A protein has these predicted regions:
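S-adenosylmethionine-dependent methyltransferases
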Residues: 1-378
Length: 378
């Protein structure tokens, strides 16, 4: 199986440097070091209200100064995403109302249960699932897909690139959606749009190059407002933020994405919040909504969330649909894992689970398909 990164910034993060000298200061969190390189901090479960996030009307603006890398797995289309090391080093520059960037850095933790659920980085089972999809050749054309607990969103992005008609991304943290999932989706959509434009131009179908229309608009808008109000960049940013309405829905201007210019992107929706409130938000809008494919990678590490997760899968999977679950056998320190989840699913009696792949190197990992038991399918 070919598996390559075409860009890799070799950086040592502060946490890596400090790892050996990490002080155990006995604060309110309990820390464990379950797997080399992964630190999990547990805290009482809290609930986070669901919010929908919208791409800005000028999508290129989210990619200013973005440093990206590309993963290529076999015959799958290349997937672009923000370089994690650069993201970590520049995290202090970002708006982060949830304060998860500072907390994860301060605690050198990849997971703070109920606060930050790990979506800032790509977890290894995502790569397993991508490999399996390459091997088995799942078809996405015209499908409605949910990337549940998406983090970087690579699984949903693959579905989008492979022709899914709608892809919904959900992550617990709004910071993850705003600063990672959305930019990653844009990186892929905008690149494809530009390639398509170039192809059309080379065939002589289009006279002029649209070439980053958005960037031109941004420049003009910014120049204009800088001239007239002499506001600094950060003042402008704050102004935009203050214009957001109270429930967190972005300013109307940000919602007005031109779907004719960005057809792929207009098939995407982005949500933050815990699974229970995500479920009520999305069903309130459309009680009949069902997904043909649900991806969920590295989301069964905490037994306390099984009920909300199972309920969400049960309510949202289409009859005849499939859930792809990618997981480690066991999550040391948090206690969850495949066997506990299997027991839970069996007790509920709603889904069959079919093991598609066991990855033996390193910590044992699995890719599992879940379908409704026959009686529930139709
Ligand atoms: C370890 S991360 C995995 C991220 C990504 N799927 C990957 O494989 O790289 C777990 C993800 O599950 C989601 N998650 C965990 N518990 C959740 C909960 N109670 N409600 C909503 N989302 C949750 C978070 O969004 C988080 O990004």
């Amino acid at each position: 199986m070919s598996f390559s990164f075409n860009f890799d910034v070799q950086l040592t993060t502060k946490c890596q440097q400090d790892e050996e000298n990490q002080p155990q200061d006995g604060n309110e969190y309990s820390e464990v070091e379950p797997v080399p390189g992964i630190t999990i901090t547990t805290q009482d479960e809290t609930v986070k209200a669901a919010v929908e996030h919208f791409p800005p009307a000028t999508p290129h603006s989210l990619l200013n100064d973005a440093v990206s890398e590309t993963i290529t797995i076999g015959t799958l289309p290349p997937l672009n995403f923000l370089n994690e090391s650069v993201f970590e080093l520049t995290a202090y520059e970002r708006d982060d109302e949830e304060m998860i960037l500072s907390q994860t850095t301060a605690q050198c933790s990849d997971l703070i249960s109920g606060v930050y659920e790990g979506g800032l980085k790509v977890w290894e089972c995502t790569y397993d699932l991508l490999e399996l999809l390459e091997r088995d050749g799942e078809r996405f054309a015209e499908k409605i897909v949910l990337d549940l607990g998406c983090g970087a969103g690579l699984l949903g992005i693959l579905a989008l690139k492979r022709g899914a008609s709608q892809v919904h991304f959900q992550d617990y943290n709004s910071t993850v959606i705003e600063h990672v999932t959305l930019p990653n989706t844009l990186l892929n959509c905008l690149e494809e749009e530009e390639e398509e434009e170039e192809e059309e131009e080379s065939k002589g179908k289009k006279p002029g190059k649209r070439q980053n229309n958005d960037e031109v608009i941004i420049e003009e808008e910014e120049e204009e407002s800088m001239k007239s109000t002499e506001k600094t960049k950060s003042e402008l940013k704050n102004k935009q933020k203050n214009e957001e309405v109270e429930d967190g829905r972005p300013h109307a201007k940000r919602q007005a994405l031109d779907s004719s210019q960005h057809p792929k992107l207009s098939g995407c929706r982005f949500f933050s919040g815990d699974w229970t409130s995500f479920l009520s938000l999305i069903l309130k809008e459309d009680p009949s909504l069902k997904y043909d494919i649900i991806f969920t990678s590295e989301t069964i590490y905490n037994k306390a969330y099984y009920s909300a997760l199972h309920n969400t899968l049960h309510r949202l999977l289409a009859p005849g649909g499939v859930i792809y679950l990618a997981t480690k056998t066991h999550y040391f320190g948090v206690g969850g894992g495949l066997h506990l989840f299997e027991q839970f699913v069996e007790e509920k009696g709603v889904f069959d689970m079919e093991k598609l792949w066991v990855v033996e190197h390193g910590l044992q990992r699995h890719v599992v398909a879940m379908h409704f038991k026959t009686k529930d399918r139709f």
